[in-house]
Amino acid sequence: MPQLNPTPWFPIMMLSWLIFSLIIQPKLLLFTPTNPPSNKTTTTTRSNPWTWPWT
Protein backbone atom coordinates (compact mmCIF):
# COMPACT_ATOMS: atom_id res chain seq x y z
CA MET A 1 0.00 0.00 0.00
CA PRO A 2 1.95 3.05 -1.21
CA GLN A 3 -0.01 5.66 0.81
CA LEU A 4 1.39 4.15 4.03
CA ASN A 5 4.97 4.63 2.93
CA PRO A 6 5.91 8.09 4.36
CA THR A 7 9.23 8.34 2.50
CA PRO A 8 7.99 10.37 -0.55
CA TRP A 9 5.64 12.65 1.45
CA PHE A 10 8.14 15.41 2.16
CA PRO A 11 9.55 15.67 -1.41
CA ILE A 12 6.03 15.63 -2.87
CA MET A 13 4.92 18.36 -0.45
CA MET A 14 8.00 20.48 -1.24
CA LEU A 15 7.52 20.00 -4.98
CA SER A 16 3.87 21.05 -4.77
CA TRP A 17 4.79 24.23 -2.80
CA LEU A 18 7.56 24.99 -5.29
CA ILE A 19 5.11 24.68 -8.19
CA PHE A 20 2.62 26.89 -6.37
CA SER A 21 5.23 29.53 -5.48
CA LEU A 22 6.99 29.73 -8.84
CA ILE A 23 4.20 29.15 -11.36
CA ILE A 24 0.72 29.71 -9.97
CA GLN A 25 1.32 32.56 -7.52
CA PRO A 26 2.93 35.01 -10.05
CA LYS A 27 0.04 34.40 -12.45
CA LEU A 28 -2.46 35.23 -9.72
CA LEU A 29 -0.56 38.35 -8.66
CA LEU A 30 -0.51 39.71 -12.23
CA PHE A 31 -4.28 39.46 -12.53
CA THR A 32 -6.00 42.84 -12.80
CA PRO A 33 -9.74 43.03 -12.23
CA THR A 34 -11.86 44.23 -15.14
CA ASN A 35 -13.81 46.68 -12.97
CA PRO A 36 -11.44 48.31 -10.49
CA PRO A 37 -13.12 49.87 -7.45
CA SER A 38 -13.68 53.59 -7.64
CA ASN A 39 -14.62 56.23 -5.11
CA LYS A 40 -18.30 56.96 -5.42
CA THR A 41 -20.19 59.63 -3.59
CA THR A 42 -22.83 58.20 -1.34
CA THR A 43 -26.28 59.61 -1.88
CA THR A 44 -28.82 59.30 0.88
CA THR A 45 -32.20 58.22 -0.35
CA ARG A 46 -35.16 59.61 1.48
CA SER A 47 -37.70 56.93 2.23
CA ASN A 48 -41.36 57.75 2.62
CA PRO A 49 -43.33 55.90 5.29
CA TRP A 50 -45.90 53.44 4.07
CA THR A 51 -49.51 54.41 4.18
CA TRP A 52 -51.78 51.65 5.43
CA PRO A 53 -55.20 52.15 3.80
CA TRP A 54 -56.99 49.56 5.99
CA THR A 55 -56.24 51.19 9.36
From Swiss-Prot:
| The UniProt record lists the keyword Ion transport | yes
Q: Which GO terms describe its biological process?
A: proton motive force-driven ATP synthesis
Q: Which UniProt keywords apply?
A: ATP synthesis, CF(0), Hydrogen ion transport, Ion transport, Membrane, Mitochondrion, Transmembrane, Transmembrane helix, Transport
The record's Gene Ontology cellular component field reads:
mitochondrial membrane; proton-transporting ATP synthase complex
Comp. bias intervals (Low complexity): 37-55
Q: Name one GO molecular function term.
A: proton transmembrane transporter activity
Provide the residue span(s) of the region labelled Disordered: 35-55
What does the UniProt entry say about where the protein is found? Mitochondrion membrane
Subunit structure comment from the entry = Component of the ATP synthase complex composed at least of ATP5F1A/subunit alpha, ATP5F1B/subunit beta, ATP5MC1/subunit c (homooctomer), MT-ATP6/subunit a, MT-ATP8/subunit 8, ATP5ME/subunit e, ATP5MF/subunit f, ATP5MG/subunit g, ATP5MK/subunit k, ATP5MJ/subunit j, ATP5F1C/subunit gamma, ATP5F1D/subunit delta, ATP5F1E/subunit epsilon, ATP5PF/subunit F6, ATP5PB/subunit b, ATP5PD/subunit d, ATP5PO/subunit OSCP.
Question: So what family is this one in?
Answer: Belongs to the ATPase protein 8 family.
The record's function comment reads: Subunit 8, of the mitochondrial membrane ATP synthase complex (F(1)F(0) ATP synthase or Complex V) that produces ATP from ADP in the presence of a proton gradient across the membrane which is generated by electron transport complexes of the respiratory chain. ATP synthase complex consist of a soluble F(1) head domain - the catalytic core - and a membrane F(1) domain - the membrane proton channel. These two domains are linked by a central stalk rotating inside the F(1) region and a stationary peripheral stalk.
Its protein name is ATP synthase F(0) complex subunit 8
